[in-house]
Amino acid sequence: MTELLKTPIHPLYAKYGAKTIDFGGWDLPVQFAGIKAEHEAVRTDAGLFDVSHMGEILVKGPDSTSYLQYLLTNDIEKIKIGKAQYNIMCYETGGTVDDLVVYKKSETEYILVVNAANTDKDFEWMVKNIRGDVSVTNVSSEYGQLALQGPNAEKILAKLTDVDLSSISFFGFVEDADVAGVKTIISRSGYTGEDGFEIYMPSADAGKVFEAILAEGVAPIGLGARDTLRLEAVLALYGQELSKDITPLEAGLNFAVKLKKEADFIGKEALIKQKEVGLNRKLVGIELIERGIPRHDYPVFLNEEEIGIVTSGTQSPTLGTNIGLALIDTAYTEIGQEVEVGIRNKKVKAKIVPTPFYKRAK
């Protein structure tokens, strides 16, 4: 059996009562105090996640911008230095290699933050598709990454840094920011639907920053609540809402797919065609009317006919209802449409509802 990978924070997990699981080959905390309590802490106060398992890939060189324009669906030329952008990397078929965030450090240097389980695959794909004068380096092992999320995130982080956090706009970042005596990159971003920051630091210093933030009375948060939080906010999870068989258009991520950008990009032709012909299926929100929780891969029916599949589902701690995301035949995606979800050997009534399920008050 292959030994599970561990983040630089791993030695501290036991001290804070973590219960760990195998997540894409990593030994990561699924929970600390409990999923519901952790979820509520992030929605009402603040919580701290160890996300050091995420991959970081450095792209450098005079042709970095044009290379990323070719590789990614969003418009890289629109990113200013000190800003980040959500992006999709596609295959020629329009299916998804990964979803990721691009940080622009300078005109010739970018960092791509990718999903942990996809890091090696993404890196190989990027190297295979290199164009022009660029270098591509997997620097994942050099970085620790923490996410401080919740309405009080700014107030808490301000105690540990001199950086004026209020001046960092959404998807903006600052480099060389001192946090608890450690040089970091602070980005105003996250995966919870709340305000918050993602903080990058050298791996060796990650534990120090982790404990300094927890010492401010912040709850440590595991993967269980990370999933319920992102699901309420309808943020895609690779392997569920996105895959090599699911295009970003089907997943409703049109805002990150710039079909009109001048640059040709991998998958552009297939995506243009899919848009012109019209989508056969699309991602919708569902809420169960009867008892039961929709889970990944459960079938969705209408009058005995299978019309789609659940990609993610949970009991929503914020709403108290059972919710899910499902890829459904476009003909049946009207809000209010009643459907049934196959849960074990039973068909359970559900309806299509508007998304996101949760949106924070500005």
From Swiss-Prot:
GO terms for biological process: glycine decarboxylation via glycine cleavage system. GO terms for molecular function: aminomethyltransferase activity; transaminase activity. Coiled coil: none annotated. It comes from the Bacteria. Keywords: Aminotransferase, Transferase. This is Aminomethyltransferase. The glycine cleavage system catalyzes the degradation of glycine. The gene is gcvT. Belongs to the GcvT family. Gene3D superfamilies: Aminomethyltransferase beta-barrel domains, Aminomethyltransferase fragment, Probable tRNA modification gtpase trme, domain 1. Pfam families: GCV_T (PF01571), GCV_T_C (PF08669). The lineage of its organism: Bacteria, Bacillati, Bacillota, Bacilli, Bacillales.
